[in-house]
Amino acid sequence: MANTEILLESGTNEIEVMQFTIFGELYGINVAKVLEIMMADKVKPIPHSHDAVEGIFKPRETLLTVINLPKYLTGECGDKKDRDLFIITNFNKMHIAFRVHSVVGISRISWEAIQKPDKALTNGEDGVATGIAQCGDNLVTILDFEKIVAEIAPETTIQVSDIDKLGDRMQREQSIILAEDSILLTKMISDSLLRAGYTNLTTFNNGREAWEFLESIRSEPDFYMRAALLITDIEMPEMDGHRLTKLVKEDENMKNMPVIIFSSLINEEMRVKGKQLGADEQLSKPEIGRLVEVMDALLDRRDIK
């Protein structure tokens, strides 16, 4: 939504969270993913689809898939009520509608106020919560909508096999830094880069951890040997990718390190923000093949210099 453009363009490390309810429980979504909210409409079922896929509907000439979020999260549909809402989203270059029971409001908070859930609750794997946020007096579960869609439609996420389409490749020794909070996506990106010949990869769970590492080596003469290029997501607990990009590009010792923002949120508005912050390139997930091509070009350009 429009107000989010003002928030993120300066790398303030803030997020606007839209709160909604499912069976009385509070959940949240980044407002940057939300196109609009509308009353639930009649949906045409799709045969042989995932249990959580209600079907399709067509508002204003745009065909949208509807995911029943109550069904996905709890296994129970409950009674579909006339007051149910559809949250229409835009991420990963897809428009998807999610059924919810009500929308409560929007809170502006710092990413520092969002904590990653304990992995012990999910057997060391990513759950469907990307973080737990304190919004006023309430604890709000921020859902990982990319993971939800990836589980329902795996073909829409990163495909390691896309690297094979790039042809034969040489091994590359440059040190790559990756800031990505999703365990699933970190593995997919890491496997893809390894297949592409990038064998020297250091990963961090959020922008804060990546920044602390970069700060710790910023004065070393071999800085660019240890951090040749940074790939960062945008949405991360503690410090987001826009804030990380801003800090790197404002630092005299780091500013020449290429920064690629690799996020599900990339659109024209986000592209403007990233450019203002100094990002060298911005790519939308799941374009992993294009990511490798851009990495090659940026690193080759730096080697020539």
Where are these regions (language model features)?
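Short amphipathic alpha-helix used as the core "switch/output" element in two-component signaling
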Residues: 242-255
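Alpha4 helix (beta4-alpha4-beta5 surface) of REC/receiver domains from two-component response regulators
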Residues: 243, 266-284, 289
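Acidic catalytic/metal-coordinating carboxylates
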Residues: 206, 240-243
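Conserved acidic segment of CheY-like receiver
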Residues: 24, 172-193, 230
